[in-house]
Amino acid sequence: MTIFDNYEVWFVIGSQHLYGSETLRQVTQHAEHVVKALNTEAKLPCKLVLKPLGTSPDEITAICRDASYDDRCAGLVVWLHTFSPAKMWINGLSILNKPLLQFHTQFNAALPWDSIDMDFMNLNQTAHGGREFGFIGARMRQQHAVVTGHWQDKHAHARIGSWMRQAVSRQDTRHLKVCRFGDNMREVAVTDGDKVAAQIKFGFSVNTWAVGDLVQVVNAVSDGDINALVDEYESHYTLTPATQIHGDKRQNVLEAARIELGMKRFLEQGGFHAFTTTFEDLHGLKQLPGLAVQRLMQQGYGFAGEGDWKTAALLRIMKVMSGGLPGGTSFMEDYTYHFEKGNDLVLGSHMLEVCPSIAVEEKPILDVQHLGIGGKDAPARLIFNTQTGPAIVASLIDLGDRYRLLVNCIDTVKTPHDLPKLPVANALWKAQPDLTIASEAWILAGGAHHTVFSHALDLNDMRQFAEMHDIEITVIDNDTRLPAFKDALRWNEVYYGFKR
């Protein structure tokens, strides 16, 4: 069972009684056929549920009201099969609090050139019925998604599926609880922010729990549970000699397993799906959680280091959005550069916490090595290189009056040399359009040093996310030019200032 099994999307047909009962019967028949086909053939992440026709203001308002209060409903897909006067939709749309997608399609793909008559024209009016619906959305300043294409078109299927993922993610975010073990890293600016504003805008809550509360749960873990988890480690990873059963770091592995089990129990008991740690607040823990965090991220939890709750929440959101898709999604940090003319590279990593979902195919290495930061015992961690190919890094920042999402499109490349002395997982990439423009644009826009890295999602996914949550998005890709980028930042300042 996946998170998408907990939700459904309602399929709503807009029409009116003007055309008579026979036309409405055909509309219903077409709708039933389309919904059945989409559910069986389109590989959508969650189920479409056909609702009764919306042919009057009261019917439409009732559907929108019910959708708003049904926890299983992630959003509405609306098809204007015939002309549906848009004033009928005003009350319903004014109370709808779920995402809305307008599927601009029609039942037939080709025109029946020899037999087309006015009955056919009246029945198949998406071409102008959809425009009427679009006007009322624009008039009410209600942004919604639009997908145009025949209902049998695979590209349309993919776009609807992508939107569904966003809709489900939005609903999940409304219930998301972020646990901060300790506070932010001292004196760091970008990881701080307005948690009340975040809950108002996105829905997720952020609260702090003392590390001592976690330590109590960690210390209560039984040796039997620890040994069972270490057996799992041995089947999934390549253990270095020091971490094997008679190795001198074996106890560190056992302690890492204890921390993982305790941390997961704490998160489950509290209903948390994202969390942060900080190396400055580890009182009672014997090592900085590394292996535990990596494995919890792989299970779908959001995480960020140094108390960075915005990135932790964004990682959870993107994990939900990408559920079931090929490729992984991880916490990441731009760590250091390789300057070489024509081949500038970014080496991304963190102290320990990179998600194995982005790893290359072979087994990760489980090792224990010294970590100078934090002042604790040497922590266990998984070491691996990352899959190659197109990816994105995304950052969510708090500008005081609004949130800005930054997205840089990147190309992950194979590490050209072994890294025998680097004891952490890492990713190597080329930033688009190049390192100079990408880094300068990122800095000018205020992007954080922490990001969410993803092979599974792309720029279109993040644009949809920004639109669905009504936040600013700043894009750095192969089309980026710094003068235009700076102008866009200035224009956005005016636009969002006006919106206040």
From Swiss-Prot:
Binds 1 Mn(2+) ion per subunit. Keywords: Arabinose catabolism, Carbohydrate metabolism, Isomerase, Manganese, Metal-binding. Mn(2+) binds at residues 306, 333, 350, 450. The keyword Secreted does not apply. GO terms for molecular function: L-arabinose isomerase activity; manganese ion binding. Its EC number is 5.3.1.4. Pfam families: AraA_central (PF24856), AraA_N (PF02610), Arabinose_Iso_C (PF11762). It is an enzyme of class 5 (isomerase). GO terms for biological process: L-arabinose catabolic process to xylulose 5-phosphate. It catalyses: beta-L-arabinopyranose = L-ribulose. Its cofactor is Mn(2+). It comes from the Bacteria. Pathway: Carbohydrate degradation; L-arabinose degradation via L-ribulose; D-xylulose 5-phosphate from L-arabinose (bacterial route): step 1/3. Belongs to the arabinose isomerase family. Catalyzes the conversion of L-arabinose to L-ribulose. This is L-arabinose isomerase. It comes from Citrobacter koseri (strain ATCC BAA-895 / CDC 4225-83 / SGSC4696). The lineage of its organism: Bacteria, Pseudomonadati, Pseudomonadota, Gammaproteobacteria, Enterobacterales.
